[in-house]
């Protein structure tokens, strides 16, 4: 069981000279479990700062590497998605470096989890068998070869929206594969939500935000609250 904390300290750090990140540390005495957070497609914006704050308040030291550090979203977005599709590349190297820095801190325990949103949720699934104790994917893209990608994975929690386009079948596919692979899991589909339903505010800025809203990708506070309750319970069980 993790220790509930309030008002975590958020600090922008340099993980390496080329890689920045956002670190959240709870107030009070540690040590705390560690969690690597992988941001959504729009980078470390106001929504992602709210998500890292929320998780750290539950008693976790959380580090979110900025996968767009080497030139911003315009330059890095394509390369990051190529890495996600291939399951290898600079983005995975950056996440691994962030994990190493995080787990070497004296104020963390020997437990480490990974959580991702949107694009980051896809990374979280692919990282589930890479030395983590628990993984949470929030509306993350599914790997092409689920059996290969999730073999030997740690326990996985998933939160998906029933109105989320190509991810409508995510629960069915993940449940079937993870059950076959005997991986502990808890996947939930929220029938009244679309993509990015856990964001506190509409993402994408004035232009993309309006387009996303039309597609059903918009906040759903009630479902988001339930998803966070599930996340805190899940990490509380597996990262204690």
Sequence positions of predicted segments:
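Serine-hydrolase catalytic machinery in alpha/beta-hydrolase-like enzymes
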Residues: 4-107, 200-217
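Short alpha-helix in the alpha/beta-hydrolase fold that links the catalytic acid
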Residues: 51, 168-178
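Active-site loop/turn elements of alpha/beta-hydrolase fold enzymes
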Residues: 60, 67, 140, 190-192
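Primarily recognizes the serine-hydrolase "nucleophile elbow" in alpha/beta-hydrolase
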Residues: 96-153
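Conserved serine/cysteine hydrolase catalytic core
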Residues: 143-153, 164, 220, 229, ...
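Short beta-strand/loop motif that positions the catalytic acidic residue
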Residues: 157-160, 190
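Acidic catalytic loop of the alpha/beta-hydrolase fold
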Residues: 162-168, 195-196
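C-terminal catalytic histidine-bearing segment of alpha/beta-hydrolase fold enzymes
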Residues: 184-240
